[in-house]
Amino acid sequence: MASKTYKIGVVGNRDAILPFRLIGFQTFPVTGAAEVVNVLRRLSREDFAIIYLTEDVAAEIPETLAYYDKQVLPAIILIPTHKGIM
């Protein structure tokens, strides 16, 4: 039985997610709420099991986060930015 391989992604503003690219995660820079929602939908369809999301971007999409909070996958984990914790 073959096991499924899942991916890890990082979504947020470009400056905040750059360090994650250096350690090998796939990064997805976004600039607005609509773009964040579209990226999350795409990543959830493309076998991303863990998505790190910057808190400043997460604050723009509370309804979308509430939806994904009820799903098994992907797990969305908020990460603070230089602006501090929400």
Please place each PLM-identified region on the residue numbering.
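Extended, charged amphipathic alpha-helical "stalk" segments
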Residues: 41, 56, 66-67
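Short secondary-structure boundary segments
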Residues: 32, 54-56, 80
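C-terminal structural segments of small proteins and small subunits
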Residues: 64-86
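Solvent-exposed alpha-helices and their adjacent loops that cap or buttress functional pockets
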Residues: 1-3, 43, 68-69
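Acidic, metal-coordinating helix/loop segments flanking the phosphotransfer/catalytic sites
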Residues: 38-45
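Glycine-rich nucleotide phosphate-binding loop and flanking beta-alpha elements
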Residues: 58-60
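Periplasmic-binding protein-like
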Residues: 49-53
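N-terminal first-folded block
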Residues: 2-37
